[in-house]
């Protein structure tokens, strides 16, 4: 009764699939998830506590291998993550599967910019949320994030991007963020 299956009839790939899912989400609060990650038992409760006073939250993650054996206690420590709009723009270092947010975030986030190579769902949602909404970091690992070769969004493939690509990527996102400022929703 509460589970609905929606077929993505548009573009395919992980970013368009997340966009399709978000367009069809009906709840007041939205939690992103990857198919192979494990939520900690207190994830929903911890996020909802923060969402009482924030519109967007991102938590830390325990990094595990494909057999669920711990590799690192903190994704954010491993990546040297810093929260906030400018820090996010300079160095994208959060996992979309650690996001939870109020529905109103979608009013600025959707539709996603069309160039999915230059705009992944998690980076776009983090930028929109930290630019336009009250956002917070939860310093607790609320998921067990599996890191192995089969990840669809493995950070390893972005490690070899040129500096020119990284500048182009950020300018593309800034251009679309400015567009969201100019459009009344």
Identify the function of each model-found stretch.
Residues 78-88, 144-149, 154-185:
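Catalytic core of nucleotide-sugar-dependent glycosyltransferases
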Residues 1-6:
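Acidic donor-binding segment of Leloir-type glycosyltransferases
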Residues 34-38, 60:
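The conserved acidic donor/metal-binding loop of glycosyltransferases
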Residues 30:
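Short aromatic/hydrophobic "clamp" motif used to bind/position activated sugar donors
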Residues 65-96:
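Acceptor/aglycone-binding surface of glycosyltransferases and processive sugar-polymer synthases
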Residues 8-25:
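Glycine-rich, basic loop-to-helix element that forms the pyrophosphate-binding segment
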Residues 23, 84-156:
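Conserved nucleotide-sugar donor-binding catalytic segment
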Residues 44-71:
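Conserved donor NDP-sugar-binding/catalytic core segment of glycosyltransferases
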